[in-house]
UniProtKB/Swiss-Prot annotation:
<dbReference type="GO" id="GO:0036431">
    <property type="term" value="F:dCMP kinase activity"/>
</dbReference>
<protein>
    <recommendedName>
        <fullName>Cytidylate kinase</fullName>
        <ecNumber>2.7.4.25</ecNumber>
    </recommendedName>
</protein>
<keyword id="KW-0418">Kinase</keyword>
<keyword id="KW-0808">Transferase</keyword>
<dbReference type="InterPro" id="IPR027417">
    <property type="entry name" value="P-loop_NTPase"/>
</dbReference>
<dbReference type="GO" id="GO:0005737">
    <property type="term" value="C:cytoplasm"/>
</dbReference>
<dbReference type="GO" id="GO:0005524">
    <property type="term" value="F:ATP binding"/>
</dbReference>
<keyword id="KW-0963">Cytoplasm</keyword>
<dbReference type="GO" id="GO:0036430">
    <property type="term" value="F:CMP kinase activity"/>
</dbReference>
<keyword id="KW-0067">ATP-binding</keyword>
<feature type="binding site">
    <location>
        <begin position="12"/>
        <end position="20"/>
    </location>
    <ligand>
        <name>ATP</name>
    </ligand>
</feature>
<comment type="similarity">
    <text>Belongs to the cytidylate kinase family. Type 1 subfamily.</text>
</comment>
<dbReference type="Pfam" id="PF02224">
    <property type="entry name" value="Cytidylate_kin"/>
</dbReference>
<dbReference type="InterPro" id="IPR003136">
    <property type="entry name" value="Cytidylate_kin"/>
</dbReference>
<dbReference type="InterPro" id="IPR011994">
    <property type="entry name" value="Cytidylate_kinase_dom"/>
</dbReference>
<dbReference type="GO" id="GO:0006220">
    <property type="term" value="P:pyrimidine nucleotide metabolic process"/>
</dbReference>
<keyword id="KW-0547">Nucleotide-binding</keyword>
Amino acid sequence: MTDLSPVLTIDGPSGAGKGTVSRIVAARLGWHYLDSGALYRAVGVAASWADLDVSDPAALVRCTFDTKVEFDDAGEAGLRVLVNGADVTSELRLETTGALASAIAAIPEVRSALKERQRAFRRAPGLVADGRDMGTVIFPDAAFKVFLTASAEERAGRRHKQLMEKGVSVTFADLLREIMARDARDAQRVVAPLRSAKDAVLIDTSGIGVEDVVQRVVGLLADRTPS
């Protein structure tokens, strides 16, 4: 039987704040949380371990089905990710992993293979789904949809600050180029290109604090939930 538990989708480009906002909103609502980007990154890690070529869709699809991905949700503190039993949480946040995940996500067969795995996260009392096609492809029937955006410069600045705080040396210019290239790949791919659902609420997070965005999203749910 199809689970009809409520779903809030939060889509947007890399660095728009959807991961942080989604985790906090899910924790406050007491709902489950799906980080679809982490799922693609996890497959990317497994593919790199197996030294697979992104030009070999059949091998990547086999890898997708053979890879066991587990999420240990720590609420607002973040998400711990295991690939075949190994903790890869820190590896998932590397820029190289993100680039590989973006390339893999452009392969229709891989997206199809992961579709039902993502939909399986939908269960009571509800789900907050964070990604790029949550509201358009994975959960088109979601009652609540949000699309977060921000300028490429704003997103590069946020990422640069995060990496510098972790002791990772990278230039703002390099990050900006990577983000702009990723935006182009995500928007131009044939299957499930990055775009806002027609019924999504658009929120530009440029210059806005995380808590303000969280309050707007939680308020949206409150306004649209029958009393």
